[in-house]
Amino acid sequence: MPCSLAFVSRCRRGFVGVFGVAWRLAWRAATFAVAAVIALVTATPATAQVASPHAIDIPRWFTESFLDFKDEVAEAARANKRVMIYFGQDGCPYCKALMVANFGGGTPASREITAKTQKHFVAIALNLWGDRETTWLDGTRAPEKELARRLAVQFTPTLMFLDTDGRVMLRLNGYQPPERFGPILDWLVGGHARSESLADYLATRDVKAAPTPAPKGAYLMRNAAALARKPGGKPLAVMFESDRCAPCAELHREAFQRPTMKPLLGRFDVARLVPGQPARLTSPAGAAVDGKAFARDLQITLHPTVVFFDDGGREVFRFDGYMRPFHVESAFEYVATGAYRREPQFQRYLQARAERLREAGKPIDLWR
């Protein structure tokens, strides 16, 4: 199938140049037919019977796009829709979770999410390492992988929701489970963005959630208000959480209890902040600031969000998507070792780390 789609991708460029955008919808339908025929003709018995265990199945309602995003935004607007861009990669357990748990339709929540997404958005899938040519909103042409690099895509899946003018309404860096993705989608399609921030919208819903126990780990700073850094000191990990946050509790209960994680935590000062506490604090840069303003200035929207600062008080990395222990540990190691200075793409660092551990004979489970 990859060969088939590559063939179709090459053909479509000349086709569009000759016949124009009037053929777009017909060509999209033909793409699937041609790809299916070529796949059947070229498939060996093995490839015909055995699917790749690492492939991510994209739902059929995603658009087979020409990847000219200015045109895609305009076409979606004519249909009273907006564009949702998905960056993913094969072998990504979080991408699989998005496609199965969120968009798979196997549960009532998934069916509701899928119906709303189809109704309000034109969904377009991009490969983080792909070579298909894209034309971004500013007219810049680049293969998928270069566009991902330019947009600083650090996590898969990454979802970008564009408005009818092509502006980014929201960007989700990493996976969000259905119980969180559903309210985010409601905020996007329900007109709430015009009256309140996503952070405020989610906060009102979190009040109804069950309370979660506050962590008491020895790795946490006793004084979470003293965040100022000094040259040569430890880097800082600031954890923005709430007291009604199941993923926050899971992070402390699972990832932070791994034997390999505890030495890493010792290389950081780790502060846990919840909304409204502390009321005043000293920022990593040494400024006295209001606690709520500190979170707002950092554009904290989701809980948990972990923001890393170097010894100069500068933000160097963050994650706010749902992550299992392997990826949490990788993020802390990425900062603790200074690898972010040498390798700006976190996904490449993850690949190298996983390979290094495998060569050392250590089992790797990306979902554990």
Across the structure, where does each feature detected by a protein language model lie?
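Proteins that catalyze or organize thiol-disulfide redox chemistry
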Residues: 3, 38-40, 46-83, 89-115, ...
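N-terminal secretory signal peptides that target proteins for export/translocation
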Residues: 1-25
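Sequence context of c-type cytochrome heme-c attachment sites
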Residues: 270
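Bacterial N-terminal signal peptides
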Residues: 17-42
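Positively charged, low-complexity intrinsically disordered regions
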Residues: 11-14, 25, 29, 181, ...
